[in-house]
Amino acid sequence: MLQELGRLLEQNMLTFDAANELAEDMSLDLASQRNSGEISNDAFLEAGVIQGGISVLATMVATGVDHSEMIVHFNQIRLRAAAICTNFPEMSVVLA
């Protein structure tokens, strides 16, 4: 999901709707994996930070924030996702 988000952002094609859809898809995937026992509740809660960051990015798009600021925010999301994947390797698939 983050790869798709990054691609859209780098091409300056990210829309509010696309970012919101990615955040919603991530929410559904995370809930499904938590409910099935594929990921722990701790991993689920940690990954929620990434989903929230994507929602913030959607708001940034909607309010016309400068593209360079959105790139900075996305890079922070990506760094946080990498840290989560270090602690919870099973999250690599969801956060990729």
Segments the model singles out, each with a brief description of its role:
Residues 1-34:
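Short terminal alpha-helical segments
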Residues 4-5, 27, 44, 66, ...:
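Helix-centric, low-specificity signal for extended rod-like, repetitive segments
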Residues 10-13, 17, 37-48, 68:
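Short, solvent-exposed segments of well-ordered alpha helices
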Residues 13, 17, 24, 48, ...:
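Generic structural signal for well-ordered, non-transmembrane alpha-helical segments
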Residues 25, 29-32, 36, 53, ...:
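Amphipathic, soluble alpha-helical interaction motifs
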Residues 40-64:
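Long, amphipathic, charge-rich alpha-helical segments that form helical bundles/coiled-coils
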Residues 62-96:
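Amphipathic alpha-helical binding modules
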